[in-house]
Amino acid sequence: MARKFLVGVVLGAVIAAGAPALAREMTSAYVVTAVANLPGAGGTDWHTDLTLYNPHSSVLYVKLVYLPTDTDNSGGAPTAPLIDLQPWETLNLWDVLGPNGFDARGGKGAMLVYADTTANSCPGTAGDTSCDFGVFARNYTLDPSGAGGEFGQDFPGFPANLGVDSTVIAYMPQISDDGDFRTNVGVASWTNAWVTVREDVQDAAGNIVGRYDHPIPPNGHEQWRLETRGLTGGTVAVYLQNAPNTAMVYPYATVVNNATGDATTVEAQITPVGLPGQAASVHAATVRRVALRSVPPPLPAPRFSLAALAHRTR
């Protein structure tokens, strides 16, 4: 298959307006909330495979933007050359943060994946599907013993229009941090400003046993160990505490088996039910209809090679 890179400045990504899609419906802009290429505890080594699928009979042009963790990315973020996703193509980018991709050894963060608004002429109107495509990711740890096995976590692309704004709250259930399991909580932000999220930790009876505020950098990513120990089968709620009216964030959690190192992804369940009154905004009714989200200025990813990424080396 002949493939080319297109060069251009990207001004934004369309997020379909109107009634939100179901979490597993395709859309034109996604956030992969956690990507990695770094050593972990117990001799593990974490990597991310990213897959794109084009359901259309025409080429779709897609952008990838890596948002490193603990970083203010408002001034720019590593951006892959524009990808021409061929009709009905399944494009597998093995170890996307590896040396043939964003070359970010030792790094972790989130990734914006979206149909380029200029190259595709995406209309961004309610119900339009002309730029919809599929985004899937898997975070996995290589077997620390050097054997061929590996364990993977499913991290499907989260539809960008279904994130947490001032109108909704995210719940992540079945959270444990005890003798058997430990939990990490993370938040990715597609907001060009600092955002503070509040984390409420609830026990199984619904009591709030911990409340913590976390600043998230512009277009940034943060992940932390759950602060409340001795929790078994509880729930974490995350909502905006201090943010501009257009803010949108994407929480998630991972629960890790202490004995085996196996991790399970806990995807956020989004709802207006239970939203604290102080988190609501007089502008809330319009926030989820924002049709264009700005992306950070592109920084080069000079080693990014689709041809090299297409070959699995492990």
Predicted regions and their residues:
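Bacterial N-terminal signal peptides that target proteins for export
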Residues: 1-9
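Bacterial N-terminal signal peptides
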Residues: 8-17
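Gly/Pro-rich, tryptophan- and cysteine-flecked surface segments typical
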Residues: 21-314
